[in-house]
């Protein structure tokens, strides 16, 4: 499989009422209950909806140079002049017109895409590997709790 290119949001994992993991499409996620948000607080609900919209608009970009970028849309209503100043000051980085943090590294191992999460630690006294296999058996790119498909 050719992994190079842009991957777009497909679905996000959440728990249903039976404590089972289910994946919600963008539309389902935007309409899903907000159990951890006071839904009587309009500002909190608006913040959560903005965050959800940002999440479903996120892309992953797998580049030929071994870099993997998580791309987020610019906040709505920010003037281009302000964006240009933030870029010039090094506050944000843009790739394909979207914001990104430092890239992660990726490599192919036995035909599979692996990426370095950058998360290091120990499990039962043994050092854990920060590299994870990206593509699941269904062909989705798994990044944390989110599934992406090749655009």
Q: Which stretches of residues belong to each language-model region?
A:
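Surface-exposed strand-loop-strand hairpins of Gram-negative outer-membrane beta-barrel proteins
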Residues: 19-36, 44, 48-50
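N-terminal helix-cap/turn-to-beta initiation motif at the start of protein domains
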Residues: 1-8
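Contiguous, well-ordered beta-strand patches that form the walls/edges
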Residues: 12-18, 42-150
């Amino acid at each position: 499989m050719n992994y190079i290119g842009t991957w777009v949001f497909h679905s996000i994992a959440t728990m249903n009422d039976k404590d089972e993991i289910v994946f919600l499409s963008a539309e389902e996620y935007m309409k899903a209950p907000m159990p951890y948000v006071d839904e009587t607080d309009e500002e909190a609900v608006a913040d959560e909806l903005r965050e959800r919209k940002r999440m479903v608009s996120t892309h992953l970009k797998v580049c030929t140079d071994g870099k993997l970028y998580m791309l987020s849309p610019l906040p709505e209503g920010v003037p281009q002049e302000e964006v240009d100043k933030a870029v010039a000051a090094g506050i944000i980085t843009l790739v394909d017109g979207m914001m990104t943090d430092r890239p992660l590294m990726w490599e192919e191992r036995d035909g599979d895409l692996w990426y370095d999460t950058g998360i290091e630690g120990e499990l039962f006294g043994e050092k854990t590997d920060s590299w994870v296999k990206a593509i699941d058996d269904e062909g989705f790119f798994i990044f944390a709790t989110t599934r992406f498909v090749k655009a």
